[in-house]
Amino acid sequence: MNEQQRLASQQANSSTKKEEKDYSKYFENVYQPPSLKDAKKRGKEEVKIERDFGLPEEFRNFGTGRKFYIRTYGCQMNEHDTEVMAGIFTALGYEPTFSTEDADVVLLNTCAIRENAENKVFGELGHLKSLKRRNPDLLIGVCGCMSQEESVVNKIMQKNQHVDMVFGTHNIHRLPYILKDAMFSKETVVEVWSKEGDVIENLPKVRRGDIKAWVNIMYGCDKFCTYCIVPYTRGKERSRRPEDIIQEIRHLAANGYKEITLLGQNVNAYGKDFEDIEYGLGDLMDELRKVDIARIRFTTSHPRDFDDHLIEVLGKGGNLVEHIHLPVQSGSTDMLKIMARKYSREHYLELVRKIKEAIPDVVLTTDIIVGFPNETDEQFEETMSLYREVGFDTAFTFIYSPREGTPAAKMKDNVPMEVKKERLQRLNTLVNTLAIEKNSRYKGQIVEVLVDGESKNNPEVLAGYTRTNKLVNFVASKSLIGQLVKVKITEAKTWSLNGELVEEPIEVK
């Protein structure tokens, strides 16, 4: 969306329905609220790629002498967005701080995937209210996926008037202008684009660490699973050009990074929106095999778009790791249909068979929702049996959380919460049982570990991850942080492995 489109959209959105309260008259500057109705639309407008991001002269030294603090909730995409916002803050002259008490600007980068995440954000806004009273010049902002929801923005306007700015996921590159508006406005600045944004290249980033890096390869999702708010908050699927991705990863490799995670809400749909070339995730991964970097992984996959070419490429190994996160959500074909997942139990199991055939030592992990509206005991048992049949190493498990604006939120639900909790407990027992069973197979093996740093539980112990994303703890010199080492596994736990260093760092060729 260019500036002209932004202004046109702003004017269009300012004309709200008569029955809705119109807050725009209270604002001197920007009031562009979200619209889930607009966010659901998938137009044929060309997605523009902007490569000339830069700060105008008016923002030179804008943040000199000021500090910023960003609290991040949710997925890796939010982590990456925070890195971009930190890069913009730094370019403006701001310095980071790890304390809200010490900050001149506090941003909450939010997640909308479950109600619990939203409750945490509103709880934090309550804590920040007293801080704002003590420091009236403090700027407080809410950004990320929650900002794309109408109900959230209305709640902020009504009950959290100490918030100075609200912006969404499509206009992070406009952070300097939003900051300026918030700094000089007497009222809350709201700038949320409900239609998909453009692809903005060359945004500054302050990455967390210098060992692993997130790299966005696409944005948005067009799947519209009935329970999921993400297609509304992140817009339509739009892919970065392969040459831009490859250039970024080569630059990271040249700067010593050892592992790259390719990000997308539906990473397997990469390239499906290209009109000038036939180029998908399999093609990209095949090219990235040639980049001089130790490990490349990706998340998150959708089974519907996981094609044979990608499986073939992953089977070539090299720097492509043997770990795939493949959310199934349910083991029941009937339940998958109600969820609008667009695949069946049989399709998923056949996909798993193909993956295991191409990558015999693959580790599969997944996401599962229990207690979806009207889920029967039989349908839940199908999920349990699929989990055993696939033999997942672990899973992220959740009780269904209604998201306002999604079709599932309107469904009548006859499953009592007590039943949902009991099902989750049973599933988690199975997950834990298989996790320790899978991890026990590593005992006595020598594995490659990329050393992340000190263990969270013991600074005398180092921690790192295998190619299959297993956490390994071992005692060794801190000089090995950031290196690839070989570790012999001596003990297997449910969520981690313990081991002993067996040789010097591995040379990455």
From Swiss-Prot:
Its main location: cytoplasm. The lineage of its organism: Bacteria, Bacillati, Bacillota, Bacilli, Bacillales. [4Fe-4S] cluster 1 binds at C75, C111, C145. Binds 2 [4Fe-4S] clusters. One cluster is coordinated with 3 cysteines and an exchangeable S-adenosyl-L-methionine. It comes from Bacillus cereus (strain B4264). PANTHER family: CDK5 REGULATORY SUBUNIT-ASSOCIATED PROTEIN 1, MITOCHONDRIAL TRNA METHYLTHIOTRANSFERASE CDK5RAP1. Residues 16-25 have a biased composition (Basic and acidic residues). Catalyzes the methylthiolation of N6-(dimethylallyl)adenosine (i(6)A), leading to the formation of 2-methylthio-N6-(dimethylallyl)adenosine (ms(2)i(6)A) at position 37 in tRNAs that read codons beginning with uridine. HAMAP family: tRNA_metthiotr_MiaB (MF_01864). GO terms for cellular component: cytosol. It comes from the Bacteria. Residues 440-503 form the TRAM domain. Monomer. This is tRNA-2-methylthio-N(6)-dimethylallyladenosine synthase. Residues 66-184 form the MTTase N-terminal domain. Keywords: 4Fe-4S, Cytoplasm, Iron, Iron-sulfur, Metal-binding, S-adenosyl-L-methionine, Transferase, tRNA processing.
